[in-house]
Amino acid sequence: MQTLHALLRDIPAPDAEAMARAQQHIDGLLKPPGSLGRLETLAVQLAGMPGLNGTPQVGEKAVLVMCADHGVWDEGVAVSPKIVTAIQAANMTQGTTGVCVLAAQAGAKVHVIDVGIDAEPIPGVVDMRVARGCGNIAVGPAMSRSQAEALLLEVSRYTCDLAKRGVTLFGVGELGMANTTPAAAMVSVFTGSDAKEVVGIGANLPPSRIDNKVDVVRRAIAINQPNPRDGIDVLSKVGGVDLVGMTGVMLGAARCGLPVLLDGFLSYSAALAACQIAPAVRPYLIPSHFSAEKGARIALAHLSMEPYLHMAMRLGEGSGAALAMPIVEAACAMFHNMGELAASNIVLPEGNANAT
């Protein structure tokens, strides 16, 4: 049975030769070189992923939604009742939430995964429960390190099993009342930013309660003393099992050489953890949308990422990842279906990248 260490060790590097071939092919298509902008760079990124066999392509698509409750909810950092996590997880199994509608439109399957809901098991939800809710990070760690490591491995294996069954494009999502608080704590730790710079309103927290949320994040960091150079330490101390789960999807997809679409702020925090745990993950991550949550810009700057969509969204669930899946498919369609300059006897002047 593969260990977490072995999984991380076996993440492949991008295929530079395949990327060079893809760039050459794209430059010969019926358009001025570079005129399709980031669609071209996305196609080249995909071509370098070993799991796609040297060419941009999309097979089956899946959005993995990690669901959990958080002890820090008790600190007054969220307005929604804790039971909403379980209710919405059940709604996801019926296909009625935001991510389900957007994923269906994109032709993707939503996998609803219970990694720590504080309720009885829900029919139709995948059971990977670590505990009924995370610890309250304002008074102690969210979980033990061994729990975090075990969940990272379990989710990574689940992701790789989906890859073996034909999934070639993953999206990550989450569901959990109060989970923007641990996400903000993680972003604060990884980027060295003060809590005031990264704490936002989450699911419509009133402005009058923001200062309390900032204080809770500061207390969580002060009490737990997470090591910013140790991604698992940060996840286990000030994160949450839903954030660990998303990190596991990223590690598993990268191990299989396949792309992962990030969602919003919660996924940025998980991406920071994934890249700290295994820097080789970074080339497999694709940013979908620019979250409207306050700390988004800081997190994305630290990841050196520019999302493809600016939609003022902050729902979470993986909604942005689902919405961006057609962009990935468009990059593949461009690569495979456009005609070539040579076939039409068109010769463009050297350096002509902006005009037809």
UniProtKB/Swiss-Prot annotation:
Homodimer. Catalyzes the synthesis of alpha-ribazole-5'-phosphate from nicotinate mononucleotide (NAMN) and 5,6-dimethylbenzimidazole (DMB). Belongs to the CobT family. It catalyses: 5,6-dimethylbenzimidazole + nicotinate beta-D-ribonucleotide = alpha-ribazole 5'-phosphate + nicotinate + H(+). NCBIfam families: cobT_DBIPRT (TIGR03160), PRK00105.1 (NF000996). This is Nicotinate-nucleotide--dimethylbenzimidazole phosphoribosyltransferase. The active site is at E317. InterPro entries: Nict_dMeBzImd_PRibTrfase, Nict_dMeBzImd_PRibTrfase_bact, Nict_dMeBzImd_PRibTrfase_N, Nict_dMeBzImd_PRibTrfase_sf. It comes from Salmonella paratyphi A (strain ATCC 9150 / SARB42). It comes from the Bacteria. GO terms for molecular function: nicotinate-nucleotide-dimethylbenzimidazole phosphoribosyltransferase activity. The keyword Glycosyltransferase applies. Its EC number is 2.4.2.21. It holds the Pfam family DBI_PRT. One of its GO terms (biological process) is cobalamin biosynthetic process. Keywords: Cobalamin biosynthesis, Glycosyltransferase, Transferase. The lineage of its organism: Bacteria, Pseudomonadati, Pseudomonadota, Gammaproteobacteria, Enterobacterales. The keyword Transferase applies. Pathway: Nucleoside biosynthesis; alpha-ribazole biosynthesis; alpha-ribazole from 5,6-dimethylbenzimidazole: step 1/2. HAMAP family: CobT.
